[in-house]
Amino acid sequence: MVKLIASDLDGTLLQNGAHDVNPIVFDQIRTLKEHGIMFAAASGRQYLNLRRLFTPVQDDIAYIAENGSLCIYNEETISKGIIEQDLAYRILDEVAKYPQYNCIISGERVCYKIGRAHV
């Protein structure tokens, strides 16, 4: 018996450069829920970006965000991967040596861009 269906976004639910999920997908997610099957949006994207993409069903699905390092269901963090603070500072120090690069640091609900390169 199927209990969970997870799908990637870019190149799967969002094809050919699409920026919005096809509304038919939301109907399918609702049908899955009616049959007791959970849907999870899985992506390298940030959690809040995923919630925005799935606004019509955002409270009915699970999220596997940040390439799997952040999993949230019912606004509760199920699991998260954390980089040790010392390692994070070492990475930032290394990136700072290359002014043409930026570093994006993602948290559960916020991200920071560090660097001088034009994005």
Residue ranges and their predicted role:
Residues K3-A18, I91:
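Asp-based phosphoryl-transfer active-site loop
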Residues M1-V2, A65:
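Short, small/polar residue-rich loop motifs at catalytic or cofactor-binding pockets
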Residues F26-R116:
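Active-site phosphate-binding/coordination module
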Residues V21-P23:
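A short acidic/small-residue loop/turn micro-motif
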